[in-house]
Amino acid sequence: MKFAIESISKNSGRLGQLRIRDGGPEFKTPLLLQTTKGGSIPWLSADVFETHVSRKPQVLQFTLSTMEQMTEALTHWNSGGGRGLSDYVGLPGHLNILLLRDPCETTPSGGNDRDILPLFTRRGKESLSSERYMEIVASFKPDMYEGLCDADTNLESAKKRVQKSVDRTEKFMQYIYEHRGKVNSTLLAPIVGGYNTFARTQSIKHAREQPAGSYGGYIFEGFHANGLSATTLDTSKLLPIVEHCVKQLEEDKPKILPGAYTPLTVLELIQQGIDVFDTSYAYCASLNFKALSFSFVQDAVEHVPFLDITDEAIKEDFTPPLSNCNCLTCQKHTRAYLHHLYKTNELLGPILLMVHNLYHYMAFFEKIRESVAKDTLPQLTELVRNQNGKTQVDYSIAANTKVISKATMGKGFAAAAV
C-alpha cells in the first residue's frame, strides 16, 4: 500500500492519494469506505449501486462480525487463487478492508478474557484468539485488515478497563506482527486507549516500535460502542484525544476512523488529520427513516439535516426529497411517495432512501476534497455547522420508534428496524 500527501494545511487538513494494491486504482483522501453488512451494501444489489450511486471503483468495508460464517466457504473459494473477497460477494472490481466490528450496530460490552477477544456475530458470541484471527484473515484474503484489538471502551470506561484494553491489544498484536508475513494483505495498526492520553500514547509507542514495513496505516478504535452512539459523541472530548494521537504518528501513513460520525464531526476530524471514514452514518439515517438533506453548497437558504419520511406532513408533498439532488430517488420520486412506501412497508422504500443517502454523502466528500484543495474547509465546516441558521444544527440520529408491526418482518423498513 502506498500513500502520498498532495497538500497539507493548518486549517483544512490534508489531501492525499492512496494506492492499496500495486497496479490498482488510486483513491483520493479524505476517503469514504462503503460500509457493508454480510458482504453486501445494505438494501442495494451490485447493479443498483453501480448504476445509480457510483460507477467508480470503491473500497468496501467488510466486518468479521457479519461475515465470520463465510470463513470455510472463502477458504475453498480462494484455494484456486486469483479470486478475491470482493469477487466472492459479487462486487468485483472494488478493493476492500476487513474490520472486526460492524460500525452500524451497537457492540455489546464485556466478555473479555485474557487471551480471547469476544466477537459478537449473528450466531452469538464467538471467541477469537490471535491464532484463529490470522487463520480467518488468510481465508478471507482482504486487501487490508485491521489488527486484532480490544476496543471495549468509551467515554465512561474506568481507567482499569482502558489499561486492560491497551495491554490486551499489545499482546494480540505482538503475535500478529510476528506472523503477518503469512498473509499477503496490508495490516492496519490499531490505536486504542479510550479517552486517556497516557493509554493512547502507550498504544502508539507499541506500534511504532515495530520494524519498518510492519503495517501500512493506523486505525483508531475505542471511542464508542458503534451504532448510533457515534452520532452523539461529545467532540470537545474526542477531538483533543485525536489531536494528541495524530501528533505522535508519521505523516506518510493513512489514518482511519470507522464509525457513524456526524458530518460536522467528520469535518472537524479531517482538520485534525484523519484520512478515511465510512458510510455507516448514511446507513443509520436510512434505517431510521431519514433522508439526508443538509447542504454543503453555499446559498442563502436555511436548511435542515434530515427529511423524516415518517412525518405525516409530507404525505401530500409531491416535491423531490431534495430539490437540488441528482440521484435516482430525487429525480424520479417524491416525498409523498417515500412516505407511502414507509406506511406500506414496501421493500422499495429503504432501497430508494439508501440510494439517496449514499449519493448525497459521497457528493459531500467530493466537496470536502475540493475544499481541502482550496484550503476552504473552515468555511464548509461553518456552513455545515449552522446550515445558514443562527444556531448549531443537531446531526445526531435517534433510534426509530415508529415500527408498524413485527408481523411485517421481511418487508421493507420493518425487516431492518424490528
From Swiss-Prot:
The keyword Metal-binding applies. Zn(2+) binds at C325, C327, C330, H356. GO terms for biological process: tRNA-guanine transglycosylation. SUPFAM superfamilies: tRNA-guanine transglycosylase. Its cofactor is Zn(2+). Its main location: cytoplasm. Binds 1 zinc ion per subunit. GO terms for cellular component: cytoplasmic side of mitochondrial outer membrane; tRNA-guanine transglycosylase complex. Keywords: Cytoplasm, Metal-binding, tRNA processing, Zinc. Non-catalytic subunit of the queuine tRNA-ribosyltransferase (TGT) that catalyzes the base-exchange of a guanine (G) residue with queuine (Q) at position 34 (anticodon wobble position) in tRNAs with GU(N) anticodons (tRNA-Asp, -Asn, -His and -Tyr), resulting in the hypermodified nucleoside queuosine (7-(((4,5-cis-dihydroxy-2-cyclopenten-1-yl)amino)methyl)-7-deazaguanosine). PANTHER family: QUEUINE TRNA-RIBOSYLTRANSFERASE ACCESSORY SUBUNIT 2 (PTHR46064:SF1). Heterodimer of a catalytic subunit and an accessory subunit. Belongs to the queuine tRNA-ribosyltransferase family. QTRT2 subfamily. This is Queuine tRNA-ribosyltransferase accessory subunit 2. The lineage of its organism: Eukaryota, Metazoa, Ecdysozoa, Arthropoda, Hexapoda.
